Regions:
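A charged, aromatic-enriched C-terminal amphipathic alpha-helix characteristic of glycosyltransferases
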Residues: 401, 405-406, 415-445
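Nucleotide-activated donor-binding/catalytic signature segment of Leloir-type glycosyltransferases, i.e.
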Residues: 288-328
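Conserved donor-binding/catalytic core segment of Leloir-type glycosyltransferases
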Residues: 49-50, 237-253, 259-262, 276-278
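C-terminal alpha-helical cap of glycosyltransferases
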Residues: 15-22, 436-458
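Aromatic "clamp/platform" in nucleotide-sugar-dependent glycosyltransferases that forms part
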Residues: 341
Length: 458
């Protein structure tokens, strides 16, 4: 989930070449801020600057940012400013789409970025920190993005005593050593998505304090809807057995594995009305050309392409759907499926579980937190490989399923309707326990400690 981040960058970041760029850079002369930031003095409140994806986006990062901010806005002793990046002017949002709490100050990082690059506003952040003088700067993203912000902050040699916290999105079992060194050198505190990811960091030598900040489920937004009515509106046969994948068509999501598994499944059961719905592009944005791949897989199996060609459905648009639209897709399907070779949380599958739809997912990463044999089909990822930075800027150890194993996992719900129904009910029951209030509690606790320390020093 990282819209418009280049994932095929052949250039190794400067901060990965040498830690000198982090710890020994000369100060950068920064022009005065043009941002509409809060005053440096906020009536004795603790000041937090959250650096993350703007809430007016269609990515998982934006959803999580919104969930966190809404909880933090309830704290009367906390002043919150959001340095929200990658809100692109060409994107249109409906009125009322993720309205920010009135007491959260918002800085549009993409708008401030001159000249415009990728909309992150890396070089503008030091200016904002100098103007706002926050007690805590908290950066949320994967380490390739976090690292670029840290480099710019370090170059600026900022005055003041702000602390740097990192909400670290991990998708693979290993982080590159340069990123680990950066966290140990620069971060005062780290937050991981799950206990599993926390232990993963600790096992790689992280010495900084690590807390767990999970994700929450928006039960007022994602809720069960009548499936038959949805299918009628979408012109999908009521008797169809529909699998759904809402992930973007990008390398980590391994749509090639999904298409191979699906082709095997439809050929194995030619008389069953099996369909796959993918809410992504067809391949024109640099991912897999899904229809070409599917056609080839059918030909390799010696079947008539016309017989099964219409079983793969790909949305005509992607990255434009409102949360309410996504809820409709979730409810349209019988089963959700994920074929990724690394997953930090698995937000799409998590949300679909929340409306009562069971999932077929790899037994990796964030899925281990909320998926079990009682609410999902967990497929073992038997293939392991290491990613070069030319392929992924975060590198790491990927774990992928064999397409045949994924096919067998998808087959379980196709052939056992009672298991599918039972798992769907259990999935919803599980996910409903993940509230944002519960998720943000560890962060609130740490912020409260900082507020008490600040008051004691006053």
């Amino acid at each position: 989930m990282r819209i418009f981040v280049i994932r095929m960058d052949s250039a190794v970041p400067d901060y990965m070449k040498s830690l000198q760029s982090i710890v020994g850079a000369a100060p950068l002369v920064v022009s005065p801020s043009t941002s509409n930031t809060a005053s440096a003095s906020v009536d004795g409140k603790l000041k937090l600057l959250l650096v993350s994806t703007h809430c007016h986006q269609y990515t998982g990062y934006s959803k999580v940012s919104y969930g966190i901010l809404r909880q933090l806005s309830k704290l009367p002793w906390l002043s919150v400013t959001h340095y929200g990046f990658q809100k692109f002017p060409q994107q249109q949002f409906a009125e009322g789409y993720r309205t920010y709490p009135v007491n959260v100050s918002v800085i549009d990082a993409a708008k401030e970025e001159q000249p415009f690059e990728q909309g992150f506003g890396f070089k503008k952040l030091p200016d904002v920190v100098r103007s706002l003088q926050p007690d805590i700067v908290m950066i949320y993203n994967d380490m390739s993005i976090v690292g670029k912000f840290i480099v710019e902050l370090d170059k600026a040699n900022l005055p003041g005593k702000h602390k740097l916290w990192v909400y670290c999105d991990q998708v693979y079992n290993t982080q590159l050593q340069g990123y680990l060194d950066m966290l140990n050198l620069k971060a005062e505190r780290i937050f991981a998505f799950t206990n599993g990811w926390k232990n993963c960091l600790k096992g790689q030598g992280i010495t900084r304090p690590v807390d767990v900040l999970m994700h929450g489920f928006e039960q007022d937004l994602y809720k069960p809807l009548p499936r038959n009515e949805i299918r009628k509106n979408l012109k999908i046969p009521e008797d169809a057995f529909v699998y759904l994948n809402v992930n973007r068509n990008q390398p980590r999501k391994r749509y090639d594995i999904l298409v191979m598994a699906f082709a095997e499944l439809v050929v194995k059961y030619p008389t069953k009305p099996i369909f796959m719905m993918c809410i992504c592009d067809k391949g024109e944005k640099g991912g897999w050309w899904l229809f070409e791949l599917y056609q080839r897989e059918l030909k390799l199996r010696g079947v008539n392409v016309d017989q099964f060609g219409g079983r793969l459905m790909v949305s005509s648009q992607d990255m434009v759907f409102k949360d309410e639209d996504i809820n409709i897709f979730y409810n349209c399907a019988d089963v959700g499926v994920n074929s990724a070779d690394g997953e930090g949380w698995g937000l799409c599958n998590f949300e679909q579980m929340g409306v009562g739809v069971p999932q077929v997912v790899p037994n990796i990463g964030g899925f281990k937190e909320f998926c079990s044999k009682d609410n999902s089909v967990l497929v073992e990822a038997t293939q392991k490989y290491y990613l070069p930075m030319v392929y992924s800027p975060v590198g790491g150890e990927a774990q992928a399923m064999d397409p045949h194993d994924l096919c067998l996992g998808m087959e379980e719900y196709l052939l056992d309707s009672s298991k599918r129904v039972a798992h769907g009910e259990a999935a919803r029951k599980t996910v409903l326990t993940y509230t944002w209030e519960r998720a943000v509690e560890p962060l609130v606790r740490r912020l409260k400690q900082e507020k008490e320390d600040k008051d004691a020093e006053a």
